[in-house]
Amino acid sequence: MFKKSTSYTKFGLILMKVLDVCVNLMRLVRIYSTVYAIALALLNVTNRKKLLKFYSQFIKKDDLCFDIGANLGSRTEVFLRLGAKVVAVEPQNICMKKLKKKYGSNKKVFLIQKAISDNEGEEELMISDTHTISSMSKNWMKSLKSSDMLLVSTSAFQWQKSIKVQVTTLDRLIKEYGRPTFCKIDVEGYEYKVLKGLSKPIDAVSFEFIPTQEFVLIAIDTIKHLATIGKVMFNYSLGESTTLVLEEWVEPEKISSILLKLPQKTFIWGDIYAKFI
């Protein structure tokens, strides 16, 4: 069903060691987070035109969007440029400070410093200096550590501490802010729990997945849950391709079959798109 990916070459191992030294040096002089944020910003600017074109198929002017796992706001920025209002949800202090600095006075952005789950309350968030991989899923972290993803063997992939964060649900957000046209979810392995907190259809949802056996099965459980909410069709993309792989949207059983046939590659991620009809 799944194929195991190849191991590092000798050159690859040397490269990982060099990168590890660089990461540790940046941490030592306390510039790692800044350098990482700048690199992400440059990548997002380079990719912005493609993102605008891609998301325009889901989002129109004056639509409401949810950005769940907003991080530094790369998708929030795209949604705003498409004319949408955005509820941006992010539990990490370092990210929320940057979001407030950039969007705090923007009346079209509603910033929520919480995480999303299937119930309201309090949960544990594992924090990484590489803030895009902070997670509430210990299984996801374990899978990542044992993967062949680039840089995973370096100290860039560490979770230095854990904090308690307030959590709410998608249903609660909808009650408070309205029904979104599009909901983007990127929460590092916690997507199923997030969508379990949704009980009514919205126009479109995207959620991240990793094509490994464990997480494809979780993605399929997520697909099954969405199918209990309403009539829904699916597509998917890989990495930052901003391209839907399938020419036509397919039903839950078909997308599940497609995902099960993907080769096991933990260094690749993707997004599943669900469209209620």
Which role fits each region the language model picked out?
Residues 2-277:
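Phosphate/nucleotide-binding beta-alpha loop and adjacent structural elements of enzyme active sites
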